[in-house]
Amino acid sequence: MKRTKLTKMPPLRKASPQTPPGFHLLVKPSGAACNLDCKYCFFLSKEMLYPGSNIRMTDEMLRIYIRQSLDSQQTSEISINWQGGEPTLMGLNFFRRSVDYVEKFKSPGQPVLYTIQTNGTKIDKDWAAFLKQHNFLELEYGWTKGIS
């Protein structure tokens, strides 16, 4: 399969009348990769779909995703929801860049809500400060005795 590098983003269209007034997108920047092996996880075997690969959201794709997400919303409030696998495996700098792109591409005064679903194992003082600074409204985490 031939891959084309996206060096320039295509011009964006205004949202059409058929576009729903608002929607939530779930972003899985690390794909199925996770640092735990919870038996209950429905996503557990998905990493095996691409054996030997390291599928991750590139910085270029992050920039395109953020811009198109912000431009396509018809509501004043935008929601960006990070999931995985384990999204924190992308590293704190990835999320710093995502917030930078949001600030660059959002409309003036446009509120953006962030959530992240994580197992919490990578959350340290730096992560906690970042999440607090950028008002991540939800920090969902969970594991059970079934972790192996």
Predicted regions and their residues:
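Conserved non-cysteine loop/helix-boundary elements of the Radical SAM core domain that shape
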Residues: 46-61, 85-94, 122, 148
